[in-house]
């Protein structure tokens, strides 16, 4: 079991229930899933780029990503309907907790010029979205073996009803928000 999951059950859940006055354990916000998305527009010109992106995403997430394809043709971007343009992974359960632990403890502190996560990135329903500019902040990625530095989107989906509950949940896991 991941340390953060144990921490959630033992300390975070009771604290949030007390803070927001929840009567049932099921009312307490919890993290439902973490979605990682990497847009690889260059894959249209070079098919090898997608292979490298899939390899990086597999190393970071610990599970095989799904290739996302273009839904419609856009002449300006030289893409056709059905072209592979990215990859994504949805983490749940044990892998989700392990990834969150690595993200908070290892990856976020390795971001260059880091001054805290923006609290404005909540969507109004307690879910948090963030962007990472370089995949090399994750320890699984070897700097010598990457072909190009590329970023990704990370969305943390919670069962919180509003942003206040979502922020309290993530702060309980030592998420470094700007003050």
From Swiss-Prot:
The keyword RNA-binding applies. The keyword Ribonucleoprotein applies. GO terms for cellular component: ribonucleoprotein complex; ribosome. Transmembrane segments: none annotated. One of its GO terms (biological process) is translation. Keywords: Ribonucleoprotein, Ribosomal protein, RNA-binding, rRNA-binding, tRNA-binding. InterPro entries: Ribosomal_uL5, Ribosomal_uL5_bac-type, Ribosomal_uL5_C, Ribosomal_uL5_CS, Ribosomal_uL5_dom_sf, Ribosomal_uL5_N. GO terms for molecular function: rRNA binding; structural constituent of ribosome; tRNA binding. Coiled coil: none annotated. This is one of the proteins that bind and probably mediate the attachment of the 5S RNA into the large ribosomal subunit, where it forms part of the central protuberance. In the 70S ribosome it contacts protein S13 of the 30S subunit (bridge B1b), connecting the 2 subunits; this bridge is implicated in subunit movement. Contacts the P site tRNA; the 5S rRNA and some of its associated proteins might help stabilize positioning of ribosome-bound tRNAs. Belongs to the universal ribosomal protein uL5 family. Part of the 50S ribosomal subunit; part of the 5S rRNA/L5/L18/L25 subcomplex. Contacts the 5S rRNA and the P site tRNA. Forms a bridge to the 30S subunit in the 70S ribosome. This is Large ribosomal subunit protein uL5. It comes from Shewanella sediminis (strain HAW-EB3).
